[in-house]
């Protein structure tokens, strides 16, 4: 009989603002391992000390999870540090071009995952759960770069993950908007 092990969630408030040029965009949408390193170096030791808990070091027992840009951040953390995290839950994941400041290694931000990174990289030992609503965000007028359609981005993610033989699940929710409350329940 399999049982779910004890789960400890550590939630981190993001910086202010949204999109490119915001503190939140810098924290969550930056295509690097810096945020995972910050969590590992500063957040988890403090949480463990204050809550008197011990976190597993087994990456198969650790997950990252987020909504919107937090969903992109969850995959960014696992992608850059699969030795730390191997489970990703991305709800209305912002796999679009939200990164700020510009990064020449990933010029299209999280859009790079389905555009280039996953297809061109060796398969990583991570499992991914994705969800998007059919009425999720599309911001064609904010940035006219063709990389701000949440539905298309998540559909593209599912396609490239399947082509690369990843362990993943893609949930396409009908009549659902961005981070749709009824879908969460």
Please report, for each region that a protein language model flagged, where it lies by residue:
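Non-catalytic cap/lid and distal C-terminal segments of serine-dependent acyl enzymes
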Residues: 1-185
């Amino acid at each position: 009989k399999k049982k779910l092990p004890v789960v400890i969630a550590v939630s981190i408030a993001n910086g202010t603002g949204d999109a490119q040029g915001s503190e939140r965009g810098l924290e969550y949408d930056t295509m690097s391992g810096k945020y995972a390193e910050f969590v590992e170096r500063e957040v988890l030791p403090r949480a463990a000390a204050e809550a008197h808990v011990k976190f597993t070091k087994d990456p198969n027992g650790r997950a990252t999870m987020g909504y919107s840009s937090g969903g992109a951040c969850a995959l960014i953390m696992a992608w850059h540090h699969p030795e730390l995290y191997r489970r990703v839950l991305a709800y209305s994941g912002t796999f679009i071009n939200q990164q700020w400041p510009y990064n020449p290694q990933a010029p299209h931000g999280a859009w790079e995952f389905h555009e280039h990174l996953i297809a061109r990289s060796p398969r990583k030992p991570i499992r991914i759960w994705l969800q998007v609503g059919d009425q999720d965000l599309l911001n064609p007028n904010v940035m006219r770069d063709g990389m701000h359609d949440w539905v298309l981005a998540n559909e593209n993610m599912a396609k490239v993950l399947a082509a690369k033989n990843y362990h993943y699940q893609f949930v396409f929710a009908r009549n659902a908007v961005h981070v749709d409350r009824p879908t969460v329940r």
